[in-house]
Amino acid sequence: MRLWRSPLLLLVVVVELFSWADALTRFISADSLSTCMTDSQLSASKLYASYFPDNQSVAFDISIQSLVSTNVSIDVDISAYGIEIKKVIDPCDMEISGFCPMQTGNIALSGSHTLTGEALSILDSIPSIAYTVPDLDAVVTINIYESDTNTQLACVRTTVQNGRSVYHRAVYWVMCMVIGIPLLIFLLISPVLQTPALWEIVETMITLFQFAQIQALYSMMATSLPAIIYSWGRNFMWSMGIIRIGFMQDVFTWYVKSTGGTPSTLVDLGIHANVALAKRGIDLGSLAKRATTTVTTSTSDSITLRGIKRISYMMGIETTNFFATGFSFFIILLFFSLLVAMASRFIVEMVLLASRNQALKKQRIRLYWKSISKGFFYRVIFVGFTQMSVLSMWEIYTRDSSALAFLSMYVIVDMAVLLCYAFVRTIQIIRKTGPYSHPDVLYNLYSDTQHLMRWGFMYVQLDVRFFYFTFPLLLITLVRSMFIGFGQGSPKVQGCAMFGISVVVFALMVILRPYATKHMNTLHIGVALMNLISGSFILVMCQAFYVEELARQVIGIIFFALNAITMLLLILGIFIRTLIVLFRKSGHGTYYRILDDQSEKATSYNKSIKDMSSSDMAFSDPAYSGTTLRSSVDLNTPEYPFSNRNDSDSTFTNNKYVSPWDAIEEASYANLRGNTDVEQPFMESDYTRISENNNNAERRRKPLPNNAFR
């Protein structure tokens, strides 16, 4: 048991999981050099150097500006995972060209060389683990002193990589196809097929997608985190619309410049850009202002990128094009939804031209077309709210150009207004139906087909008692986006905020359990728990309080391992659950609308109707109050399945079902499989029959138990 008490040994054991990397070519490299003292007399405009331990050779391409013209000694300090290696080098003993003595002016070195002697002994002291651990987090600091007076002349610093990373382009695209494409398909189908099974599938897909977005948000934080966390988040940047396409980047650069902004050129400069990616909170150089993010060859210019700037550069996207890239793919998704809506109507119309009973079917299409098309757009806006809120907050904070800043403000306000409108319309439907305390008011909310097609995504996945719960979740998303976008200059605040938000969400999920089924509550509680653990790790690693560097790196590896395992389990579990729901023989009893029919409420209501006349009871009994709203659409009348008649003369009279949704749900499964044996629910308008049988208790909908899914 002593093995696990040592963080260093634990780190070694975890790293052995990546032993497959030994089969690849081993090397370490550095591609940037920044100054670490004021008035440093040595700087670099270009640096690329790699060491290959297998053949003991080094390849380099260096351009250095020197103001030193004397003999010097070089102190080398290598720091990785809390371990430090220090060496003192005499350039004359090692016969380094241009350094014995050092010469003023530009020093250009390029080529390859096989190392021997002291230089080889220094590099051989590097542990073999440095060549295999993914996302190596190592820093090399070089201090140059005058040999005679021991006066410090220069200080430069570089980060070291080994080519191993948990980010892979293949993983990036596989995750995009596995998570994004199924979500898009079910999202576009959901306004058309209003079945409880589809509601459950869409909600689980959205949950998986939002978990992927959270992973991307971690990599966009300016908080000083281990490099492995940033690389892991890069695998999910597609969920934020960050997909690099060459010609689009050229268009965005032109647009930024033409609208008064100064486009960044870091990616275009390539190896000629002396860019340092911030690691472990070390200030590797002065952070250039956004409006003047360019690279020069002066002795003090070097650029350090953090947070969104860092991830943008790593994804090959200019920092000034970050918002435009994400926004463009959101617009493409909206346009694709429009094409799907238009194509679907065209195809259906063509099919109906050759079918019988054309008048009735055409009337259905025309009746529902507006609701279905609006449902497409509202669902895309709902799913893209996290993406666009973060990108808009970032653009408002940075103001790459006046046009982009205005566009970002318009987009976030427009999306927020549309989602608020959907929520308000839901509240209005409830208020028109009756008081909230009425047993059937919330049941009717789930039977208005046109409302379901447009705004059902706001509440169909929830327990009817918490139909409003999507709205506070959107507010939490907006607050999180503000901390990510506006908090790029306050990394510690970002880390604390992410932890606080995860605590709030976890508490809400555990205490309220707001979703309609036990399975969905379990899923969301599990995701919230994983986000809480991740938030706790970020709080530890954000340097809000002192933590040993080795401990931070171990926590970073554990963070990656837990989130990777959770993502794998979510993908497998959700897809297995989707198959079960789709191919289940009977949908009966799988997705009830649970009302908060407390015993006192049901008792008092039943007592109040005893004094009513039989005719009054026909309109007031909860068994006969109907399954649709007034002036809404009823899917379940056999004589006119898509009618738009007034429901004041319609009542639900299926004796075999406990609640309206029992019949609707089972009928939907029967229709999908062509099973005619299942009795279709129907509406009856003959109140004489109802009055004659108003004492039949079996014909009334009984209150569902409070703990049906608890």
UniProtKB/Swiss-Prot annotation:
GO terms for cellular component: cleavage furrow; division septum; endoplasmic reticulum; Golgi membrane; medial membrane band; membrane; plasma membrane; plasma membrane of cell tip. Keywords: Calcium, Calcium channel, Calcium transport, Cell membrane, Golgi apparatus, Ion channel, Ion transport, Membrane, Phosphoprotein, Signal, Transmembrane, Transmembrane helix, Transport. GO terms for molecular function: calcium channel activity; stretch-activated, monoatomic cation-selective, calcium channel activity. Residues 689-710 are annotated as: Disordered. The chain crosses the membrane at residues 173-193, 197-217, 322-342, 376-396, 404-424, 466-486, 492-512, 525-545, 555-575. It comes from the Eukaryota. One of its GO terms (biological process) is calcium-mediated signaling. Belongs to the transient receptor potential (TRP) ion channel family. This is TRP-like ion channel pkd2. It comes from Schizosaccharomyces pombe (strain 972 / ATCC 24843).
